[in-house]
Design a protein with these regions (language model features):
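Amphipathic alpha-helical dimerization/coiled-coil segments
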Residues: 71-111
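Short, cationic-aromatic polyanion-contact patches
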Residues: 1-11, 25, 58-80
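Key DNA-contact positions within bacterial/archaeal DNA-binding proteins
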Residues: 38
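Short capping segments at the starts of secondary-structure elements
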Residues: 19-25
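A short acidic, leucine-rich amphipathic alpha-helix
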Residues: 28-32
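A short, conserved structural fragment
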Residues: 48-58
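Short, hydrophobic-biased segments on the C-terminal half of alpha helices
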Residues: 44-45
């Protein structure tokens, strides 16, 4: 559904990954979606140039996140939240395989 709204499946998957993790590197998106690195980097660069995303370097890794100063972020996040909240836990576990930090014992796997 998001691919039809945003006009691009790669962009839709990038937005879902950003919504889930809040901050991601391109390799994680590639791993989670099975999309090629060139396609992911092209979309990330376009969104950064448009002011939708911002990035920072940590060592040799570039981390991307939504630009909190952009007026478009709130409506974009609301659209993504509708899709994300309607996804089953199994689908979320399948799509977002990598954990960003350890989970406390007894805590839910997906928010």
């Amino acid at each position: 559904m998001l691919d039809k709204l945003f006009g691009n499946e790669t962009l839709a998957m990038i937005f879902l990954n950003l919504f889930h993790y809040e901050e991601v590197y391109s390799g994680l998106i590639e791993k989670n979606t099975g999309t090629g690195s060139r396609a992911v980097l092209n979309q990330l660069n376009k969104m950064e140039e448009a002011g939708i995303l911002v990035s920072r370097e940590v060592g040799r890794t570039r981390l991307y996140q939504f630009n909190p100063k952009s007026p478009f972020i709130k409506p974009i996040k609301e659209i993504i939240n509708i899709t994300y909240s309607n996804m089953s836990i199994k689908l979320k576990e399948k799509m977002f395989k990598e954990r960003m930090r350890p989970r406390a014992k007894g805590k839910e796997v997906i928010k």
